[in-house]
Regions:
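Bacterial N-terminal signal peptides that target proteins for export
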Residues: 2-14
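Signal peptide-directed extracytoplasmic domains
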Residues: 74-106, 116, 134
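Extended amphipathic alpha-helical interaction segments
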Residues: 118-238
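Short, structured motif recognition centered on aromatic/hydrophobic residues
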Residues: 43, 56-57, 114-125, 133, ...
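Bacterial signal peptide processing site
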Residues: 26-29
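Start-of-domain marker
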Residues: 31-68
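A cross-kingdom marker for long, charged
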Residues: 40, 205-296
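C-terminal motif of bacterial Sec signal peptides marking the signal peptidase cleavage site
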Residues: 21-24
Length: 296
């Protein structure tokens, strides 16, 4: 799940691009078809753009969504059908791992496209705009440090539990006491990662700032290298905590799903069916891929 921490605002772009369409809202297609507008609003929070620049950015985002709709969404439908079939005899660790690995690989492909979009578009901005962008990242860093570093252990574990309950109940409905206990018991084994995550983010933001301030013509390649090497520069404690928490997360999901009631099972299958239907509708309504805008 290394894609959960992305550079240059890409994490939230990725969330908009993939997870927003899985957010459980009543209309997946409605949200997906308006992602260009939503992403545009988000980018304007980081840098001031002219009308021509906004139009250029929207064109690039449209091309990204065309690619995602044509080449990625069909696989989502297959995975969801396979996942539903695996529920019949009780979900196994191997089956859950397969789905999670598929999603991570898909997220990595989208992450690469988002990174290309941001760097290529960034190359069209002025030096002043790029500095404005990185200063906003630094402001975000300060807010993240204030939010997470002051959090107590009790608050941290409570947040973890609430997030799991919220995400799982969205697909299952009200959780049973046994399911809630499974979440509470296993999430208590989590190793705090927020301190390490904030430190890791601060490191690459500082590296990016140095590159952008120098304004070297090769800054796009340097920025890309910062991202691609970010994992190599992480402290071993970060990687160990991340791996541990990933295992625990999968244990929680497996335990809760396999304790589902017949009512929860019906709801889960109904939700899976809705996503498959929505994804198929999006695929059918897709536009031809703009390969020039994607840089292909």
């Amino acid at each position: 799940m290394s894609w959960l921490i992305l550079p240059f605002g890409a994490r939230r772009l990725l969330i908009l691009g993939v997870l927003l369409c899985l957010s459980g809202c009543s209309s997946t297609t409605f949200l997906y078809n308006r992602l260009d507008t939503l992403i545009g609003w988000y980018v304007l929070d980081y840098v001031s753009l002219s009308r021509d620049q906004r139009n250029d950015f929207n064109r690039r985002v449209d091309a990204l969504l065309d690619w995602h709709r044509a080449e990625e969404l069909p696989a989502y439908v297959v995975w969801l059908h396979e996942f539903e079939e695996s529920l019949d005899e009780g979900l196994t660790e191997v089956e859950l791992d397969k789905l999670v690995d598929q999603l991570e690989e898909a997220a990595s492909r989208l992450q690469a496209k988002v990174l290309d979009l941001l760097i290529n578009f960034g190359a069209t901005l002025s030096h002043e705009q790029r500095i404005e962008f990185v200063l906003t990242l630094q402001k975000d860093q300060a807010e993240l440090e204030k939010k997470y570093l002051a959090r107590t252990d009790d608050a941290y574990y409570q947040d973890i539990q609430q997030q799991f309950q919220k995400n799982l109940s969205r697909f299952l409905g009200t959780l049973t006491d046994s399911q809630k206990n499974a979440i509470e018991e296993r999430s208590a084994k989590y190793q705090r990662l927020d301190f390490l995550w904030v430190e890791d983010r601060g490191r690459w933001v500082s590296q990016l700032e140095r590159v952008l301030r120098v304004n070297d013509p090769d800054w796009p390649d340097q920025a890309r290298e910062i991202y691609l090497k970010r994992r190599d520069n992480r402290d071993s404690a970060y990687e160990q905590a991340f791996a541990r928490n990933t295992i625990i997360s999968r244990e929680i999901i497996l335990s809760v799903l396999n304790q589902r009631t017949s009512k929860q099972d019906l709801r889960l299958r109904r939700e899976i069916g809705k996503y498959c239907t929505d994804f198929e509708a999006l695929i059918e309504s897709g536009q031809p891929i703009n390969r020039e805008a994607l840089g292909l």
